[in-house]
Amino acid sequence: IYTNNKMKTKVYRFCLMVVMAIVPLAISATTAYGSNDKDIVRNCTAAPNGEKRCSYALKKEYQAVEHRISNKLLLLRPADDGVFVDSESKRAYANTIRNILLSTLNDAEIAVISRGKANCLNIKIGKDGKALLVEMVLGEDCDNIISQSHIKKVLKRVARVKANGIRDLRVNQYYDYYMSIVATQHSVR
């Protein structure tokens, strides 16, 4: 009986250690992007055709947190109030950004990107208040093909382009807390 109790104690201690090791990892995984559902205000209304349309915004306390510069994020403000109403709007913005990016690259740069695999360079669209966030994501297959400085150069060139009703396209400014809601990814091939 004594041996069994001793073994039970060891098992309990081991299980406790495992749980204590896993919990911090789980917490850090959910907060890796500095944003989760509790930071987001969602407003949904029914459209005349019965379709549910939702807009998303960060809570006010996060909207004013302007923090640091990133060479991977591009902040752009659309000509309207910038509220996404449905996934189709998100997709339209994603396509617009993809087209702007392609139009600012020269043939040699497009060829360099094309040598990567499909997930070499992806475009994600998120939202912070009334501004849109466009994130240029370098995939693992792209590490040795395109440098961070190259992406920054491309983004600065994109920032000078005005197209499809989008104005005030700017780089090097974004809010630290941003929505993790992401549009469909588009690979630049």
Question: Where do the protein language model's features map onto the residues?
Answer:
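Bacterial Sec-dependent N-terminal signal peptides
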Residues: 1-44
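Charge-biased low-complexity segments
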Residues: 31-189
